[in-house]
Amino acid sequence: MKIGIINTKIRTVFSAFACMIAASLVCTMPARAVVEININKGVIEPLPIAITDFLSADQLGSNITSVIAADLERSGLFAPIDKGAFIEKISNPDAAPRFEDWKVINAQALVTGRITKQPDGRLKAEFHLWDTFGGQQMIGQQFFTTPDNWRRVAHIIADAIYERLTGDKGYFDTRVVFVDESGPAQKRVKRLAIMDQDGANVRFISDGRALSLTPRFSPNRQEVTYMSFEGGSPKVYLLQLETGQRELVGNFPGMTIAPRFSPDGQKVVMSLLQDDGSANIYTMDLRNRTTTRLTSSQAIDTGASYSPDGSQIVFTSDRGGRPQLYVMGADGSNPRRISMGDGSYSTPVWSPRGDLIAFTKQSQGQFSIGVMKTDGSGERLLTSGFHNEGPTWAPNGRVLMFFRKAAGAGGPKLFTIDLTGRNERQIQTPNFASDPAWSPLLE
């Protein structure tokens, strides 16, 4: 199944610059309005926003509205107003609303829209974002797509609203690959699955006959690398999401652990278990299948993750006694320890923004998800509990997804949390779920 579903172009004009999104667009926008969210503040008060049901001949308009509202509310930055409080009934979403009616209910922003079916069977989705207190339109767009892609349209609209009001890219039109876990604990079946970031449209991409772990997206969103125990020994595979075809990256004599793509998609970094019981970090060039050894310690070096520019790698090593975080050059040069707190650190992953590293920390019987600056300073624990593990970044670097197994629970579940640590949400999945990996924005 192709990830880049909506293949026509959208252009949204923002006062002084243009931004490309994936779909077809007509847009008008006046000068920047006053209403906005400063996401760099320590404590953020969610912005009251009114999202009216998109006009349509069937339930689809209301369904799209619900997805938009859920996306924005789940971010923790927006507070959708209950529709029962609305005074004005929108009959023409293209016309300026009665701003006073929306100011009365403290709606600082207003979304109106319409869904119509075209003669060729496609859907036309139109929406407008209004600054109610400034009395002006902030965005006006229209999109064309096939009916089965209506959820993507909703996510793209939510992304446009998020970006316009925060100044940051959204993260709603994305997918997550993860390990689905079903069956009793003693006979747990683990297979790879992919879903929208909100838990919708789950699709299994492995059959569960062999244990599959650590799935990771390629930068182009079209491939997933993962570890499979097919045949009894761990091997690293590349899976083409569109065709379902897969290929063996390498059949190494020892265990292969935690493969992950480089930012340019040309290499995979991973750990290989050595004969002496140590594990060292290697890269494989996918163009010619050559491997390069980056670490040569007698320790367990694993969990490697590239910086966004590809110049550095963060990894976990117990070379100092217990697992800690280290950063080295992409060629293995100048390894240096960056974690200095009590406890053990693992599963580091570099933020897409380049400013933070997320990690799992085990200390005093608790597993925590935390972040630190790339030099190890400013460590903050966002959530702690019986077992939290495996953070992965949203593509805008503002939200993390991870998995949690609560004490006494039958298996793990997926959760998201923002960088304030105050907005934690569970992602509903059909079964137990672990080891998520977030995709870049879709195209």
From Swiss-Prot:
Family statement drawn from the similarity comment of this UniProt entry: Belongs to the TolB family.
Cysteine pairs bridged by disulfides in the record: none
Coiled coil keyword on record: no
GO biological process, alphabetically ordered: cell division; protein import
One family name in Pfam for this protein: TolB_N
PANTHER family xref list: PROTEIN TOLB, PROTEIN TOLB HOMOLOG
CC per GO annotation: periplasmic space
Record text on subunit structure and interactions: The Tol-Pal system is composed of five core proteins: the inner membrane proteins TolA, TolQ and TolR, the periplasmic protein TolB and the outer membrane protein Pal. They form a network linking the inner and outer membranes and the peptidoglycan layer.
Record keywords: Cell cycle, Cell division, Periplasm, Signal
Signal peptide extent: 1-33
Keyword Nucleus: no
Function: Part of the Tol-Pal system, which plays a role in outer membrane invagination during cell division and is important for maintaining outer membrane integrity.
Lineage: Bacteria, Pseudomonadati, Pseudomonadota, Alphaproteobacteria, Hyphomicrobiales
Coiled coil: none
Protein name per Swiss-Prot or TrEMBL: Tol-Pal system protein TolB
Subcellular location: Periplasm
Primary subcellular site in the record, as a coarse category: periplasm
